[in-house]
């Protein structure tokens, strides 16, 4: 079962919660409220999305968490983003089919001046059992409080959570930019993207192996940007992936 997590310290979460209307309260667990949007549990959390540390509560209500969050960037522009969280070298469990379905639903609803992107794995929380997907609106106060933008996110999410998930080749990306250049492959339904190991982190065999393991489904394809992954680590990573039966696509 899916779980939507809204954080009262986050402006996009607050706008999202308001747009959902009156949600029946199911129960209270400490400082968490568990409400319901039709058949989907909605966990209301008082802190920041990146500070969420109540995975034990999530385990009792579902398996796949979707965090509603604001997006910030150095050069702000209107954008919808999707990504799996993780503070390297550890990461959360990634759900490639879910994350890519949400990306497609958002991109299909784009309107000017917004764009859409799939981001590299970054920031906490790091989940151990529950898959985590961040869905974000960026990148300034104007967009965070924009009811049309947040409503677009809500519509896209409802479409995905209330429909059977399409399943395309599960893939991870190694050594790409923060805003992955592989997004178009996901939009064309050639792959479903899980973890993206960005070029700016220390890319070690151990970190890649952890990311490979922490997916809801076995990864069938790894897209590796060889210029951004230096030897001897690159050779060890390639061997590890091939030993596990993962198809490797080299770029750059």
Curated annotation (Swiss-Prot):
InterPro entries: Deacylase_DtdA_archaea, DtdA. It holds the Pfam family tRNA_deacylase. GO terms for biological process: D-amino acid catabolic process. One of its GO terms (molecular function) is D-aminoacyl-tRNA deacylase activity. Binds 2 Zn(2+) ions per subunit. Its cofactor is Zn(2+). Its EC number is 3.1.1.96. Signal peptide: none annotated. Disulfide bonds: none annotated. It catalyses: a D-aminoacyl-tRNA + H2O = a tRNA + a D-alpha-amino acid + H(+); glycyl-tRNA(Ala) + H2O = tRNA(Ala) + glycine + H(+). SUPFAM superfamilies: AF0625-like (SSF142535). Keywords: Hydrolase, Metal-binding, Zinc. Belongs to the DtdA deacylase family. PANTHER family: D-AMINOACYL-TRNA DEACYLASE. Monomer. D-aminoacyl-tRNA deacylase with broad substrate specificity. By recycling D-aminoacyl-tRNA to D-amino acids and free tRNA molecules, this enzyme counteracts the toxicity associated with the formation of D-aminoacyl-tRNA entities in vivo. HAMAP family: Deacylase_DtdA. This is D-aminoacyl-tRNA deacylase.
């Amino acid at each position: 079962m899916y779980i939507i997590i809204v954080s009262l310290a986050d402006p996009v979460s607050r706008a999202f919660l308001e747009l959902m209307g009156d949600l029946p309260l199911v129960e209270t667990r400490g400082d968490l409220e568990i409400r319901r949007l039709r058949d989907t549990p909605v966990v209301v959390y008082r802190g920041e999305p990146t500070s969420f540390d109540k995975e034990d509560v999530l385990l009792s209500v579902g398996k796949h968490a979707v965090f509603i969050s604001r997006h910030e960037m150095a050069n702000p522009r209107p954008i919808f983003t999707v990504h799996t969280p993780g503070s390297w070298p550890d990461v959360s469990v990634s759900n490639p089919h879910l994350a890519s379905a949400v990306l497609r639903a958002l991109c299909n609803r784009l309107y000017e001046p917004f764009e859409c992107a799939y981001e590299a794995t970054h920031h906490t929380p790091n989940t151990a059992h529950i898959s985590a997907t961040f869905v974000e609106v960026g990148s300034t106060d104007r967009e965070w409080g924009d009811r049309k933008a947040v409503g677009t996110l809500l519509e896209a999410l409802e479409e995905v959570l209330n429909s059977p998930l399409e399943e395309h080749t599960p893939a991870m990306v190694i050594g790409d930019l923060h805003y992955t250049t592989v997004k178009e492959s996901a939009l064309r339904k050639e792959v479903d993207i899980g973890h993206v190991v960005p070029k700016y982190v220390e890319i070690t065999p151990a970190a890649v192996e952890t990311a490979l393991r922490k997916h809801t489904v076995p990864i069938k394809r790894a897209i590796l940007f060889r210029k951004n992954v230096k030897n001897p680590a690159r050779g060890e990573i390639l061997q590890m992936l091939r030993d596990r039966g993962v198809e490797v696509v080299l770029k750059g």
